Amino acid sequence: MDLKTAVFNAARDGKLRLLTKLLASKSKAEVSSLISEKTNGATPLLMAARYGHLDMVEFLLEQCSASIEVGGSVNFDGETIEGAPPLWAASAAGHLKVVQSLLNHGASVNNTTLTNSTPLRAACFDGHLEIVKYLVEHKADLEVSNRHGHTCLMISCYKGHKEIAQYLLEKGADVNRKSVKGNTALHDCAESGSLDIMKMLLMYCAKMEKDGYGMTPLLSASVTGHTNIVDFLTHHAQTSKTERINALELLGATFVDKKRDLLGALKYWKKAMNMRYSDRTNIISKPVPQTLIMAYDYAKEVNSAEELEGLIADPDEMRMQALLIRERILGPSHPDTSYYIRYRGAVYADSGNFKRCINLWKYALDMQQSNLDPLSPMTASSLLSFAELFSFMLQDRAKGLLGTTVTFDDLMGILCKSVLEIERAIKQTQCPADPLQLNKALSIILHLICLLEKVPCTVEQDHFKKQTIYRFLKLHPRGKNNFSPLHLAVDKNTTCVGRYPVCKFPSLQVTAILIECGADVNVRDSDDNSPLHIAALNNHPDIMNLLIKSGAHFDATNLHKQTASDLLDEKEIAKNLIQPINHTTLQCLAARVIVNHRIYYKGNIPEKLETFVSLHR
């Protein structure tokens, strides 16, 4: 174990005597260097503060001049917090004496993590009331929110820490402050079921506001299934009759899909139906749908007590009612609407009803693409689920275990929607696509193409497939490390796209169809590797031969001046199958001489040859 690690471990474990020995013979500069260095992203002081070693903290500050504000990585409940200062770590862990010492030594009370979380927020999160009080007494700002706009009061409400919430309110915390998504502290109480805190907030004049999705605290409670909050708010003076009805109907939908309690759902739906008809002079009927939805098996919402009673004998119809109600009340843009449609589809798939699953998932995907930003993780998850489902169906079909077939139209429809997602992302120039999300979407598309190659099709269908792939390639999309689709097709890492296996990469079939549809075989990634370089790294001679036959330049070099041949594993059979001499021309040898001898050629030879020579740099 090196000295740096030994110093770090001693500080983390609170072994002051050992640390003193380790540093005894070191110069001031050496001590400073050892104490300031990070191990696993954290300084010795940060670890000492995290684990509450007061004597160690004071020794590091007073004897070693450790920097009191330098942040680092700390782990809480399995989550790594980046950029956490020592005061934040001590506050989160509940070490009051360490917090007091750090502040006495000049620590900034409002110094934040990378996500803009303050020490006060950290103490509020885990319910450390005495630390909260001490920080506030030392001028901690109650209103500093994290990157999501979530305040100390909000997190106290969400975590159910009533005494802390009360203390913050007494100290003047803004009870109606909104997060980035428009949530208030009342929403946090509703989502966590903290009824007592909600009552207290209302005493401090909290307002029933809607969030960014148009959700009131009452609807938030209905979505999360907190009946105590729903019962309380449906009797609140600020709640209208229509809001009460919607809340009860939505709560019933939650009982169906989240709690899996059909009788409980009926109880709340009956309450809502009785409210609709309670005033015979002013019956509140459900809106008449303009069209019936095929994915919901053309179900209609029940509109009378008699129709509601009829649902008892048809559990499947009840589940469709839940989806209809949720879409009507929350709208298509709310994440829960598409989430539970997908959930219901997955349940159908588990029971072998793949047709119902595909119809529901397609409907959810259309909803997501119409309402979410391009390459949203939720949309990517839907596309991946389709790829995994189709792969499973094709495997079981091949084994003769499954009667249902995967049709070309099903697969092609999802490929088209996947390409549409890339088009949407590339058109959004003001906000460039996240490379990791784009890489995932590109990988999913390649898996879908791979699956399509296993499905029989007509000449017209084959033409449409290649036309779509051509359109996809013309978008010139790039993934991680600036990989083109062809780079991804020849890389083994493309195999790992989700939890379940879909297709195996490198894929000769996918590579072949990409080339046939116009993929550039000499395209470069950020390390100047061509697809041939990546195929060589993956030791796939068949793909290398295909790329070379299709015009890939064999002795082109990458950023590290390596050819594809240099990257082949000598132990692999590929070395024997790819003979450099068979693919090296006199023109290549001349270009190498020019590059190796640094002969100035720009402007002295035709532009086309300049490009050729540059391939050999």
UniProtKB/Swiss-Prot annotation:
Gene name for this UniProt entry: Fem1c
Summary of the function given for this chain in its UniProt record: Substrate-recognition component of a Cul2-RING (CRL2) E3 ubiquitin-protein ligase complex of the DesCEND (destruction via C-end degrons) pathway, which recognizes a C-degron located at the extreme C terminus of target proteins, leading to their ubiquitination and degradation. The C-degron recognized by the DesCEND pathway is usually a motif of less than ten residues and can be present in full-length proteins, truncated proteins or proteolytically cleaved forms.
Protein name, per record: Protein fem-1 homolog C
Keyword Repeat carried by entry: yes
Expression by tissue: Widely expressed. Expressed at higher level in testis.
Annotated InterPro entries: Ankyrin_rpt (IPR002110), Ankyrin_rpt-contain_sf (IPR036770), TPR-like_helical_dom_sf (IPR011990)
GO cellular component assignments: Cul2-RING ubiquitin ligase complex; cytosol; nucleoplasm
Pfam family, one: Ank
